């Protein structure tokens, strides 16, 4: 389950209902979707071949079909990051700066973990996401992302239109201080 980390001196938020409420009040959609048991053979592997990525996506297609019908998403892919990915640090450097997109950034974490940071109306906070977490960052929301110390994540990315996913960087620090 996700954990919210706020400014120093404020306790983290760990209870699922409180996490949902905190994020909902800020316009961020969050849910906890259990990864199907029949996907464990693929989610447990560190490295996936392209054919295995597609197989895993198909095992998760019930979520995609629901999002297509309710939210208009048109495509999805699976990003698999781990310490052995060539150029991992360069890839991550694109996302750990504060930026926004003109479309939602929608992720379903099916293995591993990472951290989204947000700047909303002068408030900064982190959302540590883990397996089974679903998060939708609203369009035009200043945020950043980085992997936690485990440096491992598998996430389904859902898109309405790929052109809306280009990062637009802003002059803002990603520090909670």
Curated annotation (Swiss-Prot):
> What is the name of the protein in this document?
Acireductone dioxygenase
The EC number(s) attached to this protein equal: 1.13.11.54, 1.13.11.53
Show the catalytic activity: 1,2-dihydroxy-5-(methylsulfanyl)pent-1-en-3-one + O2 = 3-(methylsulfanyl)propanoate + CO + formate + 2 H(+); 1,2-dihydroxy-5-(methylsulfanyl)pent-1-en-3-one + O2 = 4-methylsulfanyl-2-oxobutanoate + formate + 2 H(+)
Site positions (Important to generate the dianion) are 107
* Function as written in the Swiss-Prot or TrEMBL entry: Catalyzes 2 different reactions between oxygen and the acireductone 1,2-dihydroxy-3-keto-5-methylthiopentene (DHK-MTPene) depending upon the metal bound in the active site. Fe-containing acireductone dioxygenase (Fe-ARD) produces formate and 2-keto-4-methylthiobutyrate (KMTB), the alpha-ketoacid precursor of methionine in the methionine recycle pathway. Ni-containing acireductone dioxygenase (Ni-ARD) produces methylthiopropionate, carbon monoxide and formate, and does not lie on the methionine recycle pathway.
Organism name = Leptospira borgpetersenii serovar Hardjo-bovis (strain JB197)
- State how the cofactor is bound: Binds 1 Fe(2+) cation per monomer.
Pathway(s) it belongs to: Amino-acid biosynthesis; L-methionine biosynthesis via salvage pathway; L-methionine from S-methyl-5-thio-alpha-D-ribose 1-phosphate: step 5/6
InterPro entries per UniProt: ARD (IPR004313), ARD_bac (IPR023956), RmlC-like_jellyroll (IPR014710), RmlC_Cupin_sf (IPR011051)
Q: Kindly list the positions annotated as binding Ni(2+).
A: 99, 101, 105, 143
- GO MF term set: acireductone dioxygenase (Ni2+-requiring) activity; acireductone dioxygenase [iron(II)-requiring] activity; iron ion binding; nickel cation binding
Q: What family is reported?
A: Belongs to the acireductone dioxygenase (ARD) family.
**Subunit comment for this entry?**
Monomer.
Lineage of the native species?
Bacteria, Pseudomonadati, Spirochaetota, Spirochaetia, Leptospirales
């Amino acid at each position: 389950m996700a954990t919210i980390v706020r400014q120093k001196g404020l306790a983290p938020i760990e209870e699922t209902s409180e996490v949902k409420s905190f994020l909902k009040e800020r316009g961020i959609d969050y849910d906890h979707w259990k990864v199907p048991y029949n996907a464990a053979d693929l989610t447990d592997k560190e490295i996936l071949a392209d054919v295995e990525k597609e197989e895993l996506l198909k095992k998760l297609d019930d979520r995609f079909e629901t999002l297509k019908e309710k939210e208009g998403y048109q495509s999805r892919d699976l990003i698999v990051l781990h310490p052995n990915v060539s150029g991992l640090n360069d890839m991550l450097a694109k996302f750990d700066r504060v930026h926004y997109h003109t479309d939602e950034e929608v992720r379903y974490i099916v293995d591993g973990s990472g951290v989204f940071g947000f700047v909303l109306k002068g408030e900064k906070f982190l959302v540590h996401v883990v397996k089974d977490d679903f998060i939708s960052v609203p369009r035009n929301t200043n945020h950043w992302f980085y992997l936690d110390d485990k440096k491992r994540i598998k996430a389904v990315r859902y898109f309405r239109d790929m052109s809306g996913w280009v990062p637009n960087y802003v002059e803002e620090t990603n520090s909670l201080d």
